[in-house]
Amino acid sequence: MGQKVHPHGLRVGVIKDWDAKWYADKKNFSDNLVEDNNIRNFVKKKVYAAGISKIEIERAGKRVKLNIYTAKPGMVIGKGGQGIEALKGELKNIVSDNKNILINIVEVKSAETDAQLMAENVAQQLEKRISFRRAMKQTIQRAMKSGIKGVKTACSGRLGGADIARTEFYHEGTIPLQTLRADIDYGFAEADTTYGKIGVKVWVYKGEVLPAKKEVKEEVNA
Protein backbone atom coordinates (compact mmCIF):
# COMPACT_ATOMS: atom_id res chain seq x y z
CA MET A 1 0.00 0.00 0.00
CA GLY A 2 1.19 3.51 -0.80
CA GLN A 3 1.78 5.63 2.29
CA LYS A 4 1.60 9.43 2.58
CA VAL A 5 4.67 11.39 3.63
CA HIS A 6 4.05 14.43 5.88
CA PRO A 7 3.51 17.34 3.43
CA HIS A 8 5.32 19.86 5.65
CA GLY A 9 8.37 17.65 6.28
CA LEU A 10 8.72 16.93 2.56
CA ARG A 11 8.86 20.67 1.75
CA VAL A 12 11.16 21.90 4.54
CA GLY A 13 14.07 23.71 2.93
CA VAL A 14 12.16 24.14 -0.34
CA ILE A 15 9.12 26.33 0.40
CA LYS A 16 8.52 25.57 4.11
CA ASP A 17 10.53 26.50 7.20
CA TRP A 18 11.31 24.64 10.45
CA ASP A 19 8.91 24.85 13.40
CA ALA A 20 11.88 24.64 15.79
CA LYS A 21 14.74 27.07 15.21
CA TRP A 22 17.74 26.32 17.41
CA TYR A 23 21.06 24.50 17.49
CA ALA A 24 22.29 22.17 20.23
CA ASP A 25 25.20 19.77 20.66
CA LYS A 26 24.71 16.01 21.11
CA LYS A 27 24.60 16.38 24.89
CA ASN A 28 21.64 18.80 24.98
CA PHE A 29 19.80 17.97 21.74
CA SER A 30 17.50 15.26 23.14
CA ASP A 31 16.66 17.36 26.24
CA ASN A 32 15.66 20.32 24.05
CA LEU A 33 13.60 18.07 21.77
CA VAL A 34 11.62 16.59 24.69
CA GLU A 35 11.23 20.08 26.20
CA ASP A 36 9.85 21.41 22.88
CA ASN A 37 7.31 18.58 22.77
CA ASN A 38 6.23 19.21 26.38
CA ILE A 39 5.86 22.96 25.69
CA ARG A 40 3.70 22.36 22.61
CA ASN A 41 1.48 19.80 24.37
CA PHE A 42 1.02 22.06 27.40
CA VAL A 43 0.18 25.24 25.44
CA LYS A 44 -2.17 23.34 23.11
CA LYS A 45 -4.03 21.81 26.07
CA LYS A 46 -4.09 25.05 28.10
CA VAL A 47 -5.57 27.30 25.38
CA TYR A 48 -7.22 24.71 23.11
CA ALA A 49 -10.38 26.83 22.78
CA ALA A 50 -8.33 29.65 21.20
CA GLY A 51 -7.70 27.55 18.08
CA ILE A 52 -3.93 27.00 18.03
CA SER A 53 -2.70 26.39 14.47
CA LYS A 54 1.00 25.88 15.22
CA ILE A 55 3.73 26.82 17.70
CA GLU A 56 7.21 27.84 16.54
CA ILE A 57 10.02 27.63 19.11
CA GLU A 58 13.24 29.64 18.88
CA ARG A 59 16.15 29.19 21.30
CA ALA A 60 19.20 31.40 21.80
CA GLY A 61 21.33 31.05 24.94
CA LYS A 62 19.09 31.40 28.00
CA ARG A 63 16.13 32.65 25.95
CA VAL A 64 13.16 30.65 24.63
CA LYS A 65 10.78 32.43 22.26
CA LEU A 66 7.36 30.99 21.33
CA ASN A 67 5.48 32.16 18.24
CA ILE A 68 1.90 31.01 18.84
CA TYR A 69 -0.36 31.09 15.75
CA THR A 70 -3.96 31.36 16.91
CA ALA A 71 -7.40 32.17 15.46
CA LYS A 72 -8.48 33.94 18.70
CA PRO A 73 -5.51 35.96 20.03
CA GLY A 74 -7.66 37.69 22.66
CA MET A 75 -8.25 34.38 24.48
CA VAL A 76 -4.50 33.75 24.76
CA ILE A 77 -3.50 37.32 25.68
CA GLY A 78 -6.26 37.78 28.27
CA LYS A 79 -7.38 41.02 29.93
CA GLY A 80 -4.43 43.41 30.04
CA GLY A 81 -2.03 40.61 29.10
CA GLN A 82 -2.86 38.51 32.17
CA GLY A 83 -3.28 35.36 30.08
CA ILE A 84 0.25 35.55 28.66
CA GLU A 85 1.80 36.26 32.08
CA ALA A 86 -0.02 33.26 33.59
CA LEU A 87 1.14 31.10 30.67
CA LYS A 88 4.76 32.24 31.15
CA GLY A 89 4.61 31.39 34.86
CA GLU A 90 3.39 27.84 34.19
CA LEU A 91 5.88 27.30 31.34
CA LYS A 92 8.77 28.06 33.73
CA ASN A 93 7.98 24.73 35.44
CA ILE A 94 8.52 22.94 32.10
CA VAL A 95 11.58 24.85 30.84
CA SER A 96 14.88 23.94 32.50
CA ASP A 97 17.72 26.21 33.75
CA ASN A 98 15.45 29.20 34.54
CA LYS A 99 15.40 30.32 30.93
CA ASN A 100 13.76 33.62 29.95
CA ILE A 101 10.46 32.93 28.13
CA LEU A 102 9.13 35.29 25.46
CA ILE A 103 5.69 34.77 23.88
CA ASN A 104 4.68 36.29 20.55
CA ILE A 105 1.05 35.94 19.42
CA VAL A 106 0.38 35.75 15.67
CA GLU A 107 -3.24 35.94 14.46
CA VAL A 108 -4.42 33.40 11.89
CA LYS A 109 -6.45 35.57 9.50
CA SER A 110 -8.48 32.81 7.82
CA ALA A 111 -9.38 29.87 10.09
CA GLU A 112 -11.51 28.37 7.27
CA THR A 113 -8.38 27.63 5.20
CA ASP A 114 -6.00 26.56 7.99
CA ALA A 115 -5.68 22.76 7.82
CA GLN A 116 -5.01 22.23 11.55
CA LEU A 117 -7.96 24.37 12.63
CA MET A 118 -10.19 22.68 10.03
CA ALA A 119 -9.24 19.22 11.37
CA GLU A 120 -9.93 20.30 14.96
CA ASN A 121 -13.29 21.77 13.90
CA VAL A 122 -14.34 18.45 12.31
CA ALA A 123 -13.16 16.55 15.41
CA GLN A 124 -15.21 18.82 17.70
CA GLN A 125 -18.31 18.24 15.57
CA LEU A 126 -17.80 14.45 15.72
CA GLU A 127 -17.63 14.68 19.53
CA LYS A 128 -21.01 16.45 19.43
CA ARG A 129 -22.44 13.42 17.56
CA ILE A 130 -22.78 15.28 14.24
CA SER A 131 -22.57 12.99 11.18
CA PHE A 132 -19.00 12.67 9.90
CA ARG A 133 -20.17 13.11 6.28
CA ARG A 134 -21.96 16.35 7.11
CA ALA A 135 -19.00 17.68 9.14
CA MET A 136 -16.49 16.90 6.38
CA LYS A 137 -18.63 18.30 3.53
CA GLN A 138 -19.44 21.54 5.38
CA THR A 139 -15.74 22.10 6.18
CA ILE A 140 -14.79 21.55 2.52
CA GLN A 141 -17.51 23.91 1.26
CA ARG A 142 -16.44 26.72 3.62
CA ALA A 143 -12.79 26.31 2.58
CA MET A 144 -13.52 26.31 -1.17
CA LYS A 145 -15.58 29.51 -0.82
CA SER A 146 -12.46 31.20 0.60
CA GLY A 147 -10.67 30.80 -2.74
CA ILE A 148 -8.24 27.91 -2.19
CA LYS A 149 -7.29 25.52 -5.02
CA GLY A 150 -8.25 22.23 -3.36
CA VAL A 151 -8.97 20.41 -0.09
CA LYS A 152 -9.10 16.77 1.01
CA THR A 153 -10.39 15.37 4.31
CA ALA A 154 -10.15 11.88 5.79
CA CYS A 155 -11.88 10.34 8.82
CA SER A 156 -10.63 7.02 10.25
CA GLY A 157 -12.16 4.86 12.96
CA ARG A 158 -15.53 3.42 13.95
CA LEU A 159 -17.48 5.88 11.84
CA GLY A 160 -21.13 6.16 12.88
CA GLY A 161 -20.55 3.49 15.53
CA ALA A 162 -19.83 0.75 12.98
CA ASP A 163 -18.34 -2.52 14.29
CA ILE A 164 -15.51 -2.46 11.74
CA ALA A 165 -13.27 0.61 11.56
CA ARG A 166 -12.76 2.19 8.15
CA THR A 167 -11.45 5.34 6.45
CA GLU A 168 -13.57 7.69 4.35
CA PHE A 169 -12.23 10.49 2.14
CA TYR A 170 -13.87 13.56 0.62
CA HIS A 171 -12.09 16.00 -1.64
CA GLU A 172 -12.72 18.93 -3.94
CA GLY A 173 -10.33 20.64 -6.35
CA THR A 174 -6.72 19.47 -6.83
CA ILE A 175 -4.21 18.24 -4.23
CA PRO A 176 -0.76 17.78 -5.88
CA LEU A 177 1.03 16.08 -2.95
CA GLN A 178 4.15 15.19 -4.96
CA THR A 179 4.79 18.69 -6.36
CA LEU A 180 7.36 20.31 -4.05
CA ARG A 181 6.51 23.87 -5.10
CA ALA A 182 2.82 23.27 -4.24
CA ASP A 183 1.87 24.99 -0.97
CA ILE A 184 0.15 22.13 0.88
CA ASP A 185 -1.09 22.75 4.43
CA TYR A 186 -1.72 19.64 6.55
CA GLY A 187 -3.59 19.18 9.81
CA PHE A 188 -4.43 16.26 12.11
CA ALA A 189 -6.81 15.97 15.07
CA GLU A 190 -8.47 13.23 17.12
CA ALA A 191 -12.09 13.04 18.25
CA ASP A 192 -12.90 11.16 21.47
CA THR A 193 -16.30 9.58 20.80
CA THR A 194 -18.28 6.98 22.76
CA TYR A 195 -17.14 4.38 20.20
CA GLY A 196 -13.44 5.24 20.55
CA LYS A 197 -11.06 7.64 18.85
CA ILE A 198 -11.64 8.92 15.32
CA GLY A 199 -8.68 10.41 13.46
CA VAL A 200 -9.24 13.44 11.22
CA LYS A 201 -6.75 14.52 8.54
CA VAL A 202 -7.00 17.59 6.31
CA TRP A 203 -4.89 18.59 3.28
CA VAL A 204 -5.30 22.11 1.84
CA TYR A 205 -3.75 23.25 -1.47
CA LYS A 206 -3.26 27.02 -1.59
CA GLY A 207 -1.45 27.35 -4.92
CA GLU A 208 2.13 27.16 -6.15
CA VAL A 209 5.03 28.93 -4.46
CA LEU A 210 8.25 29.43 -6.41
CA PRO A 211 11.26 28.85 -4.13
CA ALA A 212 13.59 31.84 -3.82
CA LYS A 213 16.55 31.48 -6.15
CA LYS A 214 19.97 31.78 -4.58
CA GLU A 215 22.25 34.13 -6.46
CA VAL A 216 25.43 32.46 -7.61
CA LYS A 217 28.33 34.86 -8.01
CA GLU A 218 30.83 33.79 -10.63
CA GLU A 219 34.40 34.71 -9.95
CA VAL A 220 36.36 35.60 -13.05
CA ASN A 221 40.08 35.13 -12.78
CA ALA A 222 41.70 38.03 -14.57
Curated annotation (Swiss-Prot):
Residues 39-109 form the KH type-2 domain. The keyword RNA-binding applies. PANTHER family: 30S/40S RIBOSOMAL PROTEIN S3 (PTHR11760), SMALL RIBOSOMAL SUBUNIT PROTEIN US3C (PTHR11760:SF19). One of its GO terms (cellular component) is cytosolic small ribosomal subunit. GO terms for biological process: translation. The keyword rRNA-binding applies. This is Small ribosomal subunit protein uS3. It comes from the Bacteria. Belongs to the universal ribosomal protein uS3 family. Part of the 30S ribosomal subunit. Forms a tight complex with proteins S10 and S14. It holds the Pfam family Ribosomal_S3_C.
